[in-house]
Amino acid sequence: MIPELGRRPMHRGNEDSSFGDDYEKEIGVLLGEQQRRQVEADELERELNLFRSGSAPPTVDGSVSAAGGLFSGGGGAPFLEFGGVNKGNGFGGDDEEFRKDPAYLSYYYANMKLNPRLPPPLMSREDLRVAQRLKGSNNVLGGVGDRRKVNDNRSLFSMPPGFEGEKTGASASEWDANGLIGLPGLGLGGKQKSFADIFQADMGHGHPVAQQPSRPASRNTFDENVDSNNNLSPSASQGIGAPSPYSYAAVLGSSLSRNGTPDPQAIARVPSPCLTPIGSGRMSSNDKRNTSNQSPFNGVTSGLNESSDLVNALSGLNLSCSVGLDDRSQAEQDVEKVRNYMFGLQGGHNEVNQHEFPNKSDQAHKATGSLRNSQLRGPHGSAYNGGVGLANPYQQLDSPNYCLNNYALNPAVASMMANQLGNNNFAPMYDNVSALGFSGMDSRHHGRGFVSSGQNLSESRNLGRFSNRMMGGGAGLQSHMVDPMYNQYADSLDLLNDPSMDRNFMGGSSYMDMLELQRAYLGAQKSQYGVPYKSGSPNSHSYYGSPTFGSNMSYPGSPLAHHGMPNSLMSPYSPMRRDEVNMRFPSATRNYSGGLMGSWHMDASFDEGFGSSMLEEFKSNKTRGFELSEIAGHVVEFSSDQYGSRFIQQKLETATTDEKNMVYEEIMPQALVLMTDVFGNYVIQKFFEHGLPPQRRELAEKLFDHVLPLSLQMYGCRVIQKAIEVVDLDQKIKMVKELDGHVMRCVRDQNGNHVVQKCIECVPEENIEFIISTFFGHVVTLSTHPYGCRVIQRVLEHCHDPDTQSKVMEEILSTVSMLAQDQYGNYVVQHVLEHGKPDERTVIIKELAGKIVQMSQQKFASNVVEKCLTFGGPEERELLVNEMLGTTDENEPLQAMMKDQFANYVVQKVLETCDDQQRELILTRIKVHLTALKKYTYGKHVVARIEKLVAAGERRMALQSLTQPQMA
């Protein structure tokens, strides 16, 4: 069977460097048998084609023959690849392989009009141009593949010299055709195929995966991230034994073609000058179905053909030429690998991401042992979990042992053999991601993933999956190799140092999207329970302190914690109960500190987000009558609740001394917090009213040094106002002094202005002189301010000092007309007319006289005119009425006012406030225009008022006529 693989003898540089002949023969026989069955199936299909009807449409084989005849002049010898029957050196009748060839692309575009049924090529013209440009430089060392001109008439996808039985990895239609730089063009010489070569030639026979990967638009969009991910830094290459070893890294990509037809192909990339691997580019149709993106986040690896496990595993695989070159012990290498992995970030931006295989020849035997289990599937393999977990940073744990869940302890090689695309589990290594926080899961489900889909969320961390065969067979395991906290920390570094994140290549589904998932989940969680999260709640250590219980979110922190820290396995904040530690971990790891599911808040508690049983009972039990003494220990919690706050307020009005003392003792430590609470501030206000005098004083002392910030706060300003009303004078004065220097700021604030008003109302004038003096020179400005106008009105009401009154009124009276028309200033003028001195009202009315009609038609000034009619004297009122009637019989000013939307109210106010003589005069003038007024919307209002007045006058006259005869 071995000769069928196209193998040739090779000159061995070192007899001890190759794998055993037994392994090679065994693998060769297995692969040869698979190829033989494939050939038999193709032969059977070709025989069946002989019986096709003559009227059937042409087949691809016929097109191949025609293409070969056209290009070779009938013989078709130079284009053996087009011959469907030539299995030895051609494409073997594979339609997709045939359609990928650049020669077929030229043939297709030349003959597509002659034969419309020709299958379209899998390469675009852009791909062909790139390939042709690179074809001219294929004789340069370090070019793309081994593309030396063995036959000038051969296709671009020619084989390496001396190998007629297998195609090389250059048959891919995307990365290799696009000019993937870095594949050395060294000749193969006489080297014999190694185990890795044979293995790579048959890499495609893995389990099918249902989902197709999402592909970037072009290789150029993706190459920067992939190249950076697959370049080994110097420190990552240290310790490789042989001077010129084989080093493999799977480089995967997408096509430049604009159509989505071509499937991604996998080739082997050699990042260092070495021999080109053989047989790594062939992929069967089965393989193409295996290239599925399993990540639910559609990360940057979504366009890759092979798993990230394969990239990491083969990138450091060293097929050394000498078994004894590395004489260091296993423990020394393990220590070095841990040190290089954890601190490799100092040497290069991507060193942390490189997972190396141990540099020992017996690693091949471990890989072979894992290969036997590579076809085993876990019980939950699906689009979310391909049946194998993400490779552990400790690559030496390639044990074939399987545990209760049928997963390998470290399935790195198993994943590689099965050609699965990584792992999309919501692993706990994402410290900032609360993906594990789905409700309905406790710590016993952490190894099972989503409850609904049955996926294994923590499969990649290998938590608790130790077989009962661990002590009896397989590779020996060191306890430190399965420390779950190191796995978590290492993978967090690996994710956060991904160069694709440095380039902002998020792909729509990266680590940043996980943060969005966290926010979305937190919002959904809050809405589900409907209870705001509280801080400072006592912890219940009997509950799970796990993010899966939904009580809080996990945030990044050191995963290597002390037993007294929340991350400790034995900490009360541990994701597991104490009795689960023995169940989940072997004895070798039970004494390790550090949590398993990410860092946890020191003050996190299950009680956060859930109301106490007492409060819930109070709100649910409507029939039972509660007393204040029954909620002892829950006063603060009740105060922060809408119904609990109302209950305390009602009970405080009739509470006994003991009950008041109980409430006082509980609210005092949290007084400042409750003052700014939407419901708690009412409890504080009520306690200021009904608390004992000593308690009120002590509570007022809590306000000192906090008066200004509380005055500017929506709920705190109410507490300050209540305190200014009820506390003793000395405390009032002390509180008010804290506003000195901030008066104007408070006046212009929507909350602070109420505090200033309360100070003017409740504090003696001599103690607030600093407030009043601040207003001098700014009265007009404040009068036109939405909040300042209220403060000026309080000054006019409560400040009786002659000097203060004269200064304020002087500024107001100097701008009466302007203030009367201002949306806020008109209230100040109205306040002066209502509460001012008679001489001040006279000044205002005389200022408005001559502009009454104009002012009456203005929205805000019309209110001022009405106040003039209401509070003015008889002489002042007569002056205004005469101006409204005008000097002619037509009464033009009166007609205009009755038809105006604002002035008609002034006319109605005149009819209400004037004496009988003036009212009779006005009614006589209005009756002349009564019919015309009914045609106007606002005139109807005046007509209705007149009719009411007439009816009232008639009733009054009738009543007088009845009373006069009786008196006679």
Curated annotation (Swiss-Prot):
Residue stretches of biased makeup (Polar residues): 211-220, 227-238, 291-303
PROSITE patterns named among the record's database cross-references: PUM (PS50302), PUM_HD (PS50303)
Gene Ontology cellular component list: cytoplasm
InterPro entries, A to Z: ARM-like, ARM-type_fold, NABP, PUM-HD, Pumilio_RNA-bd, Pumilio_RNA-bd_rpt
UniProt superkingdom: Eukaryota
Pfam families the record matches: NABP (PF07990), PUF (PF00806)
Record bears the keyword Magnesium: no
Keyword check for GTP-binding: no
Region (Disordered): 1-25, 138-171, 204-240, 260-303, 360-382
Family matches, as PANTHER family: PUMILIO HOMOLOG 1-RELATED, RNA BINDING PROTEIN PUMILIO-RELATED
Name the record gives this protein: Pumilio homolog 1
Source organism (scientific name): Arabidopsis thaliana
Taxonomic lineage from the root: Eukaryota, Viridiplantae, Streptophyta, Embryophyta, Tracheophyta
